[in-house]
Swiss-Prot record:
It comes from the Eukaryota. This is Cytochrome c. Binds 1 heme c group covalently per subunit. Coiled coil: none annotated.
Amino acid sequence: ASFBZAPPGBVKSGEKIFKTKCAQCHTVDKGAGHKQGPNLNGLFGRQSGTTPGYSYSAANKNMAVIWGENTLYDYLLNPKKYIPGTKMVFPGLKKPQERADLIAYLKEATA
């Protein structure tokens, strides 16, 4: 199922998901440094593997996907299947509602 068929995302729920499942390795704050994973500020519309100052896997650079609602929705289901060879160890969010909520939060928080 694609993002177009996803339930509406809830920003507050998405923020909770980010804090519990993503914030250990990622930040969304403009100008903040990278953690284990890259800073996600400015994520939407950016090509995978291009955040300045972060050392990406070749897989992430070579994928050359443009991040948006549709690509993130598919990626977050199973990151290792979407980008084989990615350094991201997170197994993914299986529930469509959780992915929609996280994307709603990221869209606001990374802008």
